[in-house]
């Protein structure tokens, strides 16, 4: 009997096929809880193990060689400076000898001591004390200079009078009357002396100012050792922060060292400090002008400049917003630089003035978008359910169909009588590491970039531009054309709550994915594809797996914020259900998901069922007529026979089936794997789809043709594989068909490019896929996981379809259950 969900691990490591068929489908236990090394339950993209005796969150045994379980690496501590040590250095600096005699002559030791004794609170002398001291010193210096000047003047006059008298008394011909000084000559001589006196008076007037300049740079170190006063803890406002000179350098007594009033060095050290970036002065000697910031006129100039800039800058910004966007398509108000985007040509010829100034730079401003293709760029701030309709066209056409086997959108799809043939858009709007490894592989294991939460947090301010570029590049209109051409008719689109809002300290890129979701729905409409909405991540995380946004603890209906996140998830559905209840979505959004893969093996089952009922009633009250899906929560499908019996109308049960996360199924050889699908799964799905023996309408929302778990990051970032026995720490058990007999299984062939696949391997992969299509087609149908991947070829429908190991048309497979299983040639079982 069947072992049906990807969570089921009935077969485990059994090599005796008879045991498999002794198992019965109606076993009411969740048949997954033996503790044999090969019998641990595994799920897609995780290593969950569960103890049925409790509802505790799963215990994730992360590889300690990859991830340190301790806290993040501690920050490097700031250097601790010893205040007393610095003071001692300054004290020793005061004791260092000054080599220049001229400096010692100018030193006024007693005056310096008294000046330091009159410092104010800011560490400098009070203004009144400075004025008094300057006046006192100026007067004392002036008196001896006046006496010297008068003595020199008197001596010159006496010499002049003596010379004149000698000329009159002399009988020498050279001193005769013909050479006597005339009155004019005497007047000129007096004028010469008067000019000399005037120069001396000018020098006297200039002397106080020069003395003031010198005093500002007067050394505090004289012949006698003196100690510097301690520096204040905080530099007073307006006082320059002098560079503190190394005490060791001062103690060495370098002759070129000069010390300034606040601990800085003189000209000899200027070049060195300028290189260090800590010295802003321009003085070339002790008598140079003070720095510009100490000059009053510079303060006035700076003040005027500040006022002018305060006026000019805001005006320039406003003018650039109003007039600068015609020449700059990216927009000056854009929060993201999209100038390198190849997808904004639709802005050509448009004026940014069409966007109200209040909306410029916002999420509604197309000039901030990385991709404007196929959006209506006419501005509107209209919302439905609080969600914007910006980008949507006001008209639509529902007359399209993807192929002649299905009705057009404006006619009802015959659910129940015709199977869904669809694909998922995993890894696009809800990022998943194994689908887009390029976003994760450049980080080291120490960074622990393991999900969208940690990725966005690491990216910081560049998260929006990086993530939106992924949105624009990963899926395009051509993908929907290819889906139609591949014979598909439905698309399950993953998105998460941050498309609508974010909470608390969420690092997610908020709201940008919303417009990409809306455009994807319009592409589906254009090519006749119906849509299944799939909220892949809801507040708090419903399963603690990386594809919910954040790997770790389950915070939805569980833990401290369990009830808060319960309400937040209902608020989320209240908004999006109002939006998608609009008439424009009635024909295209035909399936409405509530939450992807809630881990009911850990969560209280009744709480999940009650929330499911409340959410379904809420969205249907808001006008949703689409089928509402509830996931099986990884419980045994037989249990669902008795669950939600009084549920609202128009509901689907959603089950996800994989063989590679079940250690009892991954060890099956190629032929037995096809038999498992056609014998066990076929009957299981057929039965659960009935209301008499099962639950009722059931879809398979996820499955794949992957036959190994070898894809990079499939089992979480940094984890190994079951296929090669590197999955779990301390457990090297290998789960593959030749584990016991050899040869050794390898991921090399499974991860090889599809061009290297042998014909036998391609035949197996296509038969394996078509067997699952046949089994799930007995119910409401299927959605392949997933349409596109960067490198995981066995998980990409597009890659398989283009490389010849998927049917050319999904509705025309080569194999169906009941047919003879074809030969796969000499295909080895170890890959």
UniProtKB/Swiss-Prot annotation:
- List the biased-composition ranges (Basic and acidic residues): 1-24, 44-56, 79-93, 102-115, 137-151, 198-213
Please give the residue ranges the record annotates as the region Disordered.
Answer: 1-179, 192-241
Q: What topology does the record note for this protein and the membrane? A: Single-pass type II membrane protein
Identify the InterPro entries for this entry: Glyco_hydro_5, Glycoside_hydrolase_SF, Glycosyl_hydrolase_5
Cytoplasmic face of the membrane? 1-297
TM spans (from-to):
298-318
- The protein here is known as Probable glucan 1,3-beta-glucosidase D
Which species is this record about?
Aspergillus oryzae (strain ATCC 42149 / RIB 40) (Yellow koji mold)
Q: What phylogenetic lineage does the species belong to?
A: Eukaryota, Fungi, Dikarya, Ascomycota, Pezizomycotina
């Amino acid at each position: 009997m069947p072992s049906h969900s990807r969570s089921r691990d009935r077969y485990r490591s059994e090599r005796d096929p008879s045991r498999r068929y002794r198992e019965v489908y109606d076993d009411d236990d969740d048949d997954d809880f033996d503790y044999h090394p090969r019998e641990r339950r595994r799920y897609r993209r995780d290593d969950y193990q569960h103890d049925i005796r409790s509802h505790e969150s799963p215990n994730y045994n992360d590889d300690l060689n990859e991830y340190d379980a301790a806290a993040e690496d501690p920050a490097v501590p700031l250097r601790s400076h010893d205040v007393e040590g610095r003071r001692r250095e300054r004290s020793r600096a005061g004791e260092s000898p000054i080599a220049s005699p001229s400096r010692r002559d100018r030193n006024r030791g007693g005056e310096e001591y008294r000046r330091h004794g009159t410092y104010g609170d800011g560490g400098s002398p009070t203004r009144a004390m400075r004025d008094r001291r300057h006046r006192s010193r100026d007067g004392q210096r002036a008196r001896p200079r006046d006496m010297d000047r008068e003595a020199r003047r008197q001596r010159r006059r006496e010499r002049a009078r003596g010379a004149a008298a000698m000329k009159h008394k002399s009988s020498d011909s050279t001193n005769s009357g013909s050479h006597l000084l005339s009155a004019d000559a005497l007047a000129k001589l007096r004028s010469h002396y008067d000019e000399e006196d005037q120069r001396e008076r000018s020098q006297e007037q200039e002397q106080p100012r020069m003395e003031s300049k010198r005093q500002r740079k007067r050394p505090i170190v004289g012949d006698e050792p003196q100690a510097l006063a301690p520096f204040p803890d905080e530099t007073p406002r307006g006082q320059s922060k002098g560079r503190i000179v190394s005490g060791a350098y001062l103690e060495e007594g370098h002759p070129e060292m000069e010390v300034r009033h606040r601990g800085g060095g003189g000209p000899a050290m200027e070049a060195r400090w300028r290189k260090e970036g800590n010295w802003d002065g321009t003085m070339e000697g002790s008598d140079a002008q003070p720095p510009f910031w100490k000059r009053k006129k510079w303060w006035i100039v700076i003040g005027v400049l500040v006022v002018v800039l305060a006026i000019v800058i805001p005006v320039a910004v406003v003018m650039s917003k109003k007039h600068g966007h015609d020449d700059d398509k990216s927009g000056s108000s854009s929060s993201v630089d999209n100038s390198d985007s190849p997808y904004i040509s639709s802005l050509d010829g448009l004026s940014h003035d069409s966007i109200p100034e209040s909306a410029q730079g916002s999420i509604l401003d197309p000039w901030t978008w990385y991709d404007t293709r196929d959006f209506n760029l006419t501005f509107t701030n209209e919302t439905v359910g609080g969600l914007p309709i910006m980008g949507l066209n006001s008209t639509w056409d529902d007359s399209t169909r993807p192929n002649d086997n299905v009705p057009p959108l404006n006619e009802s799809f015959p659910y129940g009588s015709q199977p869904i043939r669809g694909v998922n858009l995993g890894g696009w709007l809800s990022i998943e590491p194994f689908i887009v490894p390029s976003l994760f592989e450049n980080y080291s294991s120490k960074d622990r970039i393991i999900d969208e939460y940690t990725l966005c947090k690491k990216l910081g301010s560049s998260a929006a531009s990086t993530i939106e570029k992924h949105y624009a590049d990963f899926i395009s209109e051509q993908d929907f054309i290819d889906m139609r051409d591949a014979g598909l008719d439905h698309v399950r689109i993953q998105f998460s709550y941050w498309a609508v809002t974010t909470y608390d300290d969420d690092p997610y890129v908020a709201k940008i994915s919303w417009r990409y979701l809306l455009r994807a729905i319009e592409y589906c409409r254009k090519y006749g594809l119906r849509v299944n909405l799939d909220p892949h991540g809801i507040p708090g995380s419903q399963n603690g797996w990386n594809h919910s946004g954040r790997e770790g603890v389950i915070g939805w209906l569980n833990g401290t914020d369990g009830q808060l996140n319960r309400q937040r998830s209902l608020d989320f559905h209240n908004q999006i259900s109002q939006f998608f209840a609009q008439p424009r979505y009635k024909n295209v959004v035909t399936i409405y998901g509530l939450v992807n893969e809630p881990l009911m093996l850990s969560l209280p089952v009744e709480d999940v069922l009650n929330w499911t009922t409340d959410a379904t009633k809420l969205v249907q009250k808001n006008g949703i007529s689409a089928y509402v899906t509830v996931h099986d929560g990884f419980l045994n499908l037989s249990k669902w026979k008795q669950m939600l019996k009084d549920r609202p109308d128009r509901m689907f049960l959603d089950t996800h089936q994989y063989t590679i996360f079940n250690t009892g199924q991954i060890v099956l050889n190629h032929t037995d794997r096809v038999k498992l699908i056609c014998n066990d799964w076929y009957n299981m799905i057929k039965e659960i789809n009935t209301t008499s023996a099962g639950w009722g309408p059931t879809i398979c929302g996820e499955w794949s043709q992957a036959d190994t778990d070898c894809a990079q990051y499939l089992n979480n970032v940094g984890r190994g594989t079951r296929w090669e026995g590197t999955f779990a720490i301390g457990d090297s058990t290998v789960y593959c068909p030749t584990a016991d007999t050899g040869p050794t299984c390898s991921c090399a062939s499974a991860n090889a490019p599809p061009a290297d696949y042998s014909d036998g391997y391609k035949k197996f992969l296509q038969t394996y896929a078509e067997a699952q299509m046949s089994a799930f087609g007995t119910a409401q149908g299927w959605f392949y996981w997933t349409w596109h991947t960067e490198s995981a070829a066995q998980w990409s429908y597009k890659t398989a379809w283009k490389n010849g190991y998927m049917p050319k048309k999904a509705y025309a497979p080569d194999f169906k259950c009941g047919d003879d299983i074809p030969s796969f040639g000499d295909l080895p079982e170890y890959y």
